[in-house]
Regions:
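Radical SAM enzyme core and accessory elements
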Residues: 2-11, 17, 58-60, 91, ...
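Structural motif
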Residues: 5, 63-64, 116, 240-242
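A short, glycine/small-residue-rich beta-strand->loop->alpha-helix junction that serves as a flexible
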Residues: 13-23, 70-75
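Flexible glycine/acidic-rich beta-alpha junction loops that bind and position SAM and/or redox cofactors
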Residues: 15-16, 104-105, 202, 253, ...
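Glycine-rich beta-alpha loop elements in corrinoid/cobalamin-binding modules
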Residues: 31-164, 377-380
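Catalytic cores of alpha/beta
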Residues: 105-110, 345-359
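Radical SAM [4Fe-4S] cluster-binding motif and immediate context
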Residues: 165, 172-335, 356
């Protein structure tokens, strides 16, 4: 082992109650295992990460610090941690990776406390960067890396996506507090998180996965899935699984072997899925879905018209949404349908159409969960040449929406409240106060009329109170100013899937 250790940090983005295994940094740790010392710090466990990071850096020499950063609320704690490290240990390189620096590498590198950005899948890039740091060699040929050359920012060619089967498995046994991550959910009493596939071959206009993976999908072998989940179940007592895959059901022929594995493990599970893919599955495959104990699938319905779906480049049709709702009800699966509202072309018209489609879905499958977001344009990353010669990316986004503001140039600017709301799909610059209020009122009525099954904390009596209070408003479509529901929610706390989900 080389002397320089690596500290991998997951800044706070949630609460200890909702913390899942920090897979992004654990996958990086996997390529370091046996090669050099490493440790992780997870802000979601309630730690003072900046203080803990300084203590670890003081205890032994470190080759670098890696920080994973998502757009939105994780940027601010990432800034604070990186600033503290830079002040106390100015010679230790700081590397940012994850969605934020992949989508906005220039903004990340404009910060004086960020030395390198790892774009996209980071395992091989980090390992290669560490070799160069150890040797004092140049980094110009490290694929997937962005860096500073004097006063200029350099974007090296993109790195080809690597299949999970070619990478070492996650070192779960090295996580000293793994019990803190096996938490109760509506799936089970000890729910684990897992990722078996990377990327998505579709290019929906509003989705950041497009920029991260550029239409690529790589799948894990079924046997590796069996071994990993079997270890989590048999060694640590995990009894349910929340998949972080961007699109678990890529194709029917690849899904069937995975369903056979999950059927043998008998651990209830949740995943992301597409309506058109599931709607096209055979009756035999749907029987396998039932036997696998899939409890809920997060399905991007997105819009109420085929025209709107075409504008979004979704690649599916409204009929697929209704077909998959019917199939899910037949086979005991709860669909969690997400909708993207308020696109710049016809924000108000799309919203009213979507409300009516949601009502039809709730009639077809009353247990269906509904998640509402506002439209955000996809932030395409800069066109660095692809190391694998793959197709070029879509044009880089320079402004936020038509005639919208220019994108922020630093991490600090990205923490301004309006930008956090926009990138988290909670608002958009072209929306009027009336539209925002209309959506908020509808969402409140809908959530009270049909309380989410994901919240095990709320009592049966509490659910009944909310349902009955909202019943007349939902029946008469009187969504405006539901003051009594706002008051009731002060006393009856209800989980919001679009914020907390699992």
């Amino acid at each position: 082992m080389t002397a320089g250790a690596v500290l991998l940090i997951n800044p706070r983005m949630g609460t200890p109650r909702n913390a899942g295994l920090p897979l992004s940094i654990l996958h990086l740790a996997a390529v370091l295992e046996g090669r050099r010392p490493w440790s992780i710090l997870d802000g979601n466990l309630g730690l003072d990460v900046a203080r803990a990071a300084l203590d670890r850096l003081a205890a032994r020499p470190h080759a670098l610090v890696g920080v994973t950063v998502m757009p939105g609320p994780q940027v601010q704690p990432a800034i604070a941690i990186s600033r503290a490290i830079r002040r106390a240990f100015p010679a230790v390189p700081i590397v940012w990776g994850g969605y934020f620096p992949t989508l906005y590498p220039d903004a990340a590198l404009n910060a004086p406390y960020v030395d390198y950005v790892v774009r996209g899948q980071g395992e091989a890039t980090l390992a290669e960067l560490l070799d160069r740091v150890d040797d004092g060699a140049g980094v110009r040929d490290v694929a997937g890396l962005s860096w500073k050359d004097g006063g200029s920012i350099v974007h090296n060619p993109d790195r080809a996506v690597i299949s999970p089967d070619r990478l070492p498995r996650v070192p779960y046994e090295a996580v000293t507090d793994i019990e803190a991550y096996l938490r109760p959910s509506f799936l089970g009493s000890r729910t684990a998180v897992y990722q078996s596939a990377l990327g998505c071959r579709f290019k929906c206009e509003f989705c950041g996965v497009v920029s991260m993976w550029n239409g690529k999908t790589v799948l894990e072998a079924p046997e590796r899935l069996r071994l990993s989940l079997g270890m989590l179940r048999d060694r640590w007592g995990a009894d349910a699984v929340h998949f972080f895959d961007h699109n678990f059901f890529d194709r029917e022929e690849t899904s069937v072997p995975m369903l056979d594995v999950l059927g043998s493990l008998q651990m209830p599970w949740w995943c992301y899925a597409r309506a058109d893919t599931l709607a096209g599955f055979s009756a035999a495959t749907w029987q396998k879905i039932r036997k696998s104990r899939l409890r809920m699938a997060y399905i991007g319905a997105e819009a109420a018209s085929d025209e709107a779906l075409k504008r979004m480049r979704k690649g599916s049709r409204v009929e697929h949404t209704f077909e998959v709702a019917r199939r899910c009800r037949e086979h005991g699966v709860v669909p969690e349908f997400s909708f993207v509202l308020g696109g710049p072309d016809d924000a108000e018209g799309d919203i009213e159409q979507t409300f009516e489609l949601i009502r039809r879905l709730k009639t077809l499958h009353p247990e269906a969960e509904i998640v509402l977001y506002f439209y955000s344009p996809t932030p395409q990353r800069r066109n660095a040449p692809a190391a694998d010669g793959s197709a070029p990316r879509l044009p880089v986004l320079q402004r936020y929406g038509p005639a919208g503001p220019a994108l922020p140039a630093t991490p600090e600017e990205w923490t301004e409240p309006q930008w956090v709301r926009w990138v988290c799909h909670q608002d958009a610059p072209w929306l009027t106060p009336r539209i925002r209020r209309r959506v908020d009122d509808f969402a409140r009525v809908l959530a009270c009329r049909f309380p989410t099954i994901q919240d095990a904390r709320i009592s049966r009596a509490g659910r009944s109170v909310l349902r009955n209070l909202a019943r007349w408003r939902y029946a008469t479509r009187r969504y405006d100013n539901p003051w009594e529901l706002r008051l009731a929610r002060r006393f009856i706390r209800l989980r919001e899937p679009q914020i907390e989900s699992l």
